[in-house]
Amino acid sequence: MLLAGNIIVILMMLFVGNIGRFNPVDYPLLANLGLGFPILLVFNFVFLVVWCFLRLRTIWFPLLGFLLCYGPIRTYSPFNIPEDKPHGAIKVLSYNVFMFSSWSEPDAKKNPIVDYIVKSKADIVCLQEAQATLDDKDHIYSTLKKHYPYFKLMIKKAPGADYMVLLSKYPVLWQDSIPYGSSSNQSVAYMLDIKGTNTLVVNNHFESNGLSSGDKEGFKTLVKGELKTGEAKRQSVHLITKLGDVSARRAPQAETVARYVKKYLDKKVPVILCGDFNDSPLSYTHRTIAKELNDCFVESGNGPGIS
């Protein structure tokens, strides 16, 4: 019975770890199963411990499971030996600043988000949801411009739409909005002259999950086990359906950006792509974008990228 359970967990790990191969447009209900991948890893580790005490010769089952899922595990939670940064490396910061939380601290000089960006000393900064006053009453943009000679703002012309900001220490030759279907989210491309090399920088804010405060509260109640069986099932179906629908809208956005980027990669133009994907590392969105690129977090980061 235990062995059968371990095999089932391993098969689920393989399926969920590769869930990004399924397009959410066709399989919306599967789109967010990747969120459960770490839970399956924990279950498999528990089996590893159990076999150590009960039947040592069976320990290779969970070990094989980890080996078969090496790719998804490394994508979700990479581990790398720390190394010195290479000569000539540049520092890039991507940050969804959520309007700089200016309602809690309207003074840019005291705003912790602005302070963090300045102190990061990043060479290139890509900001999402970077709404600030255009007349500079909050002094946010002017404060950032003091530290970055090149400032680009792209505003989507729709009520409540996104502000995308690029801060750069390198010259910005042009900026371009990457068109895809979204009422508020957007992706913006910039061509930068980085030490004499034209480099494409892409700042993304893919479709938000759009969970209401009621949805979030319902999820918390669900996790705490405070709902009756019928209500818990209804709440689960509601959340899975809603997240699946959003994933189906996000998929073609990622495909559009991937096609845009590939045009420049085919011309041997270096590409730096970052942003708020609103999705998990094992998602179709991430897989589509990363197909032609190197994931810097996987290559040099450590642990799960929790934010």
Whereabouts are the PLM-identified features?
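Residue-level marker for buried hydrophobic side chains located in beta-strands
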Residues: V92-L93, C126, L273
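Active-site-proximal beta-strand elements of phosphoester/diester hydrolases
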Residues: A89-S101, N198-E207, S236-L243
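A solvent-exposed, charged loop/short amphipathic helix patch at secondary-structure junctions
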Residues: K216-L243
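Transmembrane alpha-helices and immediately adjacent membrane-cytoplasm interface residues
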Residues: L41-D84
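Structured beta-strand-rich core segments of catalytic domains in phosphoester-bond hydrolases
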Residues: F66-H87, S104, D115, I124-T221
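Stable alpha-helical elements in mature extracytoplasmic
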Residues: K109-I113, D136, I140, R250-V257, ...
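Membrane-embedded alpha-helical segments of integral membrane proteins
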Residues: L3-R55
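Active site of divalent-metal-dependent phosphoester/diester hydrolases
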Residues: V25-L35, Y150-L166, H238-I272, F277-S307
